[in-house]
């Protein structure tokens, strides 16, 4: 078992509270810092608080190797064990000998080289995203019904990988009253050239209709946006899995 806190959209999680629970019950922490490269808590980089930290170098992240990511290890011994399993768990024989199940998680030298080059501009990328947040803060300061998600205190230092807003449930976008229903009925999904169409709206944990209305309204003005992640326990594929929730994620969605 493990605790996996997430730096959602770059925002640091409540490090002190999570670590206190982990220490009390002896549960290892594996940080999901996929979106948190460059974010800090009390001046310390995310991904370095837990036993392991996970970074993503996907094409849309703060820096990229075109795909893949990195695992932050606590020491050399842990790194050697991880690399053993990441390179197919091949034993030290002149032929292929496998006594344990391994995986092919190696990153090519070409992708790694791209990542090394990206490191030279990492600070500039973080600064640019923070500048974008400053711009949104200025533009939204007098807009009623919209709250920009910002650092809750000086201890938090988000990279603002993506900027997020919370909409007042009473907010209405003129002319977009049926945006959600219309979008779902015409939506397509998939990847790699394989697509499928949605048939109807989901009845379980539908997003606030204002969210889709705002997205469509912004799209008409050439501004890209998207809904918050759907709560994982509300994904149909996980419907039979146990979940301990308090309603916050559903209300935000």
Predicted regions and their residues:
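Active-site phosphate-binding strand-loop segment of PLP-dependent enzymes
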Residues: 1-65, 70-72, 77
């Amino acid at each position: 078992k493990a605790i996996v806190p997430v730096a959602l959209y770059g925002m640091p999680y409540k490090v002190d509270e999570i670590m206190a629970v982990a220490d009390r019950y002896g549960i290892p922490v594996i940080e999901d810092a996929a979106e948190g490269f460059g974010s800090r808590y009390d001046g310390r980089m995310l991904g370095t608080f837990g036993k392991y930290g996970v970074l993503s170098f996907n094409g849309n992240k703060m820096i990229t190797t075109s795909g893949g990511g990195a695992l932050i290890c606590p020491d050399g011994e842990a790194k050697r064990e991880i690399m053993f399993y990441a390179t197919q768990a091949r034993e030290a024989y002149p032929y292929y000998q496998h006594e344990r199940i391994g995986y092919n998680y190696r990153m090519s030298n070409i992708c790694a080289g791209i990542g090394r080059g990206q490191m030279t501009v990492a600070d500039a990328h973080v600064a640019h995203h923070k500048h974008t947040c400053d711009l949104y803060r200025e533009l939204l300061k007098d807009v009623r019904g919209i709250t920009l998600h910002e650092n809750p205190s000086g201890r938090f230092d988000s990279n603002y990988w993506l900027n997020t807003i919370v909409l007042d449930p009473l907010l209405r976008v003129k002319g977009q009253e049926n945006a959600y229903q219309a979008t779902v009925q015409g939506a397509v999904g998939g990847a790699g050239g394989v697509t499928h169409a949605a048939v109807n709206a989901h009845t379980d944990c539908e997003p606030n209709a204002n969210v889709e209305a705002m997205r469509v309204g912004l799209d008409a003005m050439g501004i890209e946006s998207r809904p918050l992640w759907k709560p994982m326990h509300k994904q149909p594929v996980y419907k039979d899995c146990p979940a301990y929730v308090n309603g916050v994620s559903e209300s935000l969605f």
